[in-house]
Amino acid sequence: MFEQEMYDVTIIGGGPAGLYSSFYCGLREMKTKLIESQPQLGGKIHVYPEKMIWDIGGVTPISGGQLIKQLVEQALTFNPSIYTDEKVLSIAKNDEGIFVITAESGNIHYSKTVIVAIGGGILNPQKIEIEGAERFEVSNLNYTIKSYEKFKNKAVIISGGGNTAVDWALELMEVASKVYLTYRKDQLSAHEAQITELTNSAIECHYNSEITKLIADDQEGMIKAIALTNHETGTITEIPIDEVVISHGYVRDKELLDNSPLAIERKNDYFIAGTINSESSIPGLYAAGDILHHDGKIHLIAAAFHDALHAVNSAKKYIQPDASDGGIVSSHNDIFKQRNRKLLQESLK
């Protein structure tokens, strides 16, 4: 365990809200640290890196993976301290009003303010409940789709009946040789339009059924077939398969808020109840992105940037009450003067 230097602001969470907060903290000349529990920055967008995102103002359709790349590059503009693979367990406040952030690693971080930007929380996929299944996670048992190329010309089965499962099935139909969908109930829970498209597709659906056995090729360490059990008839169907995709939802880890001794007001036992200015019930602690809840809250990536601006400006005013309410716009901000000259010179080459 080691103790670290003081920061003006510590951002917990490295998704869109946290990354943009990092950039804007730098613009407001705050000493900034960002802590992310996963090994990489980007947040939940890593679940759909090849999905196209259309609803960010001024940004033409962009893949999730490319958006992460650009957000990270922007977040690093002012050289914040970045800690990845660092899970925060609790946030406390000492007698001097300083936030004490304790990580699972034993590290203790100190900060004048905190911005919580953990989105829907640390989300862990619901694993398939078959003994020994985890050994196939390095080969052809998947809990997300990071690249469609992996599934090209392959037989794929998807287990799940929600929006994500059906969406993946429809998209994989374009690249896979055969797509199966299995769901334990008789009706899917996806959107009606998705179900209609699925019904009219070549995807083979098995309802009231679930995967009960993974049949392996022990020499290659891969699944070569699955056994489907129909709960109504008891029929067991064996299907040869190249890739298995499990979409059973996620388990939300709310350990951070539960463990923190601060009386952070919550909504629905998880979300931080706040204001349009991203303030929480704890002075100096702010929230941005999907973790924040208030009556006017919009759950879009674009709205996460808006939350980040409010959170950073509120944090700046908290530690420096005479500071301006907002930062100077980038087009007229001297902080970018040298960078703008460099960009201009490069454009003239």
From Swiss-Prot:
EC number: 1.18.1.2
Cofactor: binding comment: Binds 1 FAD per subunit.
Sites where the protein binds FAD: 36, 44, 48, 88, 123, 290, 331
Catalytic activity reported: 2 reduced [2Fe-2S]-[ferredoxin] + NADP(+) + H(+) = 2 oxidized [2Fe-2S]-[ferredoxin] + NADPH
InterPro entries with a match to the protein in the record: FAD/NAD-bd_sf (IPR036188), FAD/NAD-binding_dom (IPR023753), Fd--NADP_Rdtase_type_2 (IPR022890), Ferredoxin-NADP_redctase_2 (IPR050097)
Cofactors required: FAD
Keywords: FAD, Flavoprotein, NADP, Oxidoreductase
Enzyme class: oxidoreductase
GO molecular function, one term: NADP binding
Keyword Flavoprotein: yes
Stored PANTHER family: THIOREDOXIN REDUCTASE 1-RELATED-RELATED
Assembly with partners or alone: Homodimer.
Family indicated by similarity: Belongs to the ferredoxin--NADP reductase type 2 family.
Name this protein carries in UniProt: Ferredoxin--NADP reductase 1
UniProt source species: Lysinibacillus sphaericus (strain C3-41)
Species classification: Bacteria, Bacillati, Bacillota, Bacilli, Bacillales
